């Protein structure tokens, strides 16, 4: 008698419905550049959205690491007054 929409999953003390999961997957789909650019290709499976989300997060993390390394190298190559100024700007 329970429909797909009314089913829920219990995670700890909270309940989440299939409809809420579908809404979250749709929100992720809209955020992913790879999938957002291909909207006319039709419906994308939740599995694909989650795989693309994981891949996108890994890529963003790698970019952050690379930029952090570049910034560290830049700060090492500048004099201490300039480095202090850059650090103070970054902390704001």
UniProtKB/Swiss-Prot annotation:
- Quote the cellular component terms of the Gene Ontology held in the record: nucleus
Name the keywords, alphabetized.
Gibberellin signaling pathway, Growth regulation, Nucleus, Transcription, Transcription regulation
GO biological-process terms attached to the record: gibberellic acid mediated signaling pathway; photomorphogenesis; regulation of growth; regulation of timing of transition from vegetative to reproductive phase
> Transmembrane stretches, by residue range?
none
UniProt tissue specificity: Expressed in roots, leaves, stems and flowers.
Q: Where is the bHLH domain?
A: 5-60
Question: What Pfam family is a match, any one?
Answer: bHLH_ILI
Q: Which PROSITE patterns match?
A: BHLH
Please tell me whether the keyword Nucleus is annotated for this protein. yes
* Gene Ontology MF, one: protein dimerization activity
Superkingdom of the source? Eukaryota
Give coiled-coil spans as residue ranges. Answer: none
* Stretch forming the signal peptide: none
Summarize the record's disruption phenotype note.
Pale-green sepals and carpels and decreased chlorophyll levels.
Do you know which InterPro entries this protein is assigned to?
Answer: bHLH_dom, HLH_DNA-bd_sf, PRE
The UniProt record describes its induction as: Not induced by exogenous gibberellin.
Compartments, record wording: Nucleus
Q: Is Transcription included in the keywords of this UniProt record?
A: yes
Sequence similarity: Belongs to the bHLH protein family.
Biological function: Atypical and probable non DNA-binding bHLH transcription factor that integrates multiple signaling pathways to regulate cell elongation and plant development. Regulates light responses by binding and inhibiting the activity of the bHLH transcription factor HFR1, a critical regulator of light signaling and shade avoidance. May have a regulatory role in various aspects of gibberellin-dependent growth and development.
Quaternary structure and interacting proteins, as annotated: Interacts with HFR1 and IBH1.
The UniProt entry, under PANTHER family, shows:
TRANSCRIPTION FACTOR PRE, TRANSCRIPTION FACTOR PRE4
User: What other note does the entry give for this protein?
Assistant: Plants over-expressing PRE4 show long hypocotyls, pale green and slightly narrow leaves, elongated petioles and early flowering. They are not sensitive to the gibberellin inhibitor paclobutrazol during seed germination.
Task: Name it.
Answer: Transcription factor PRE4
What is the native source organism of this protein? Arabidopsis thaliana
Q: Identify the gene encoding this protein.
A: PRE4
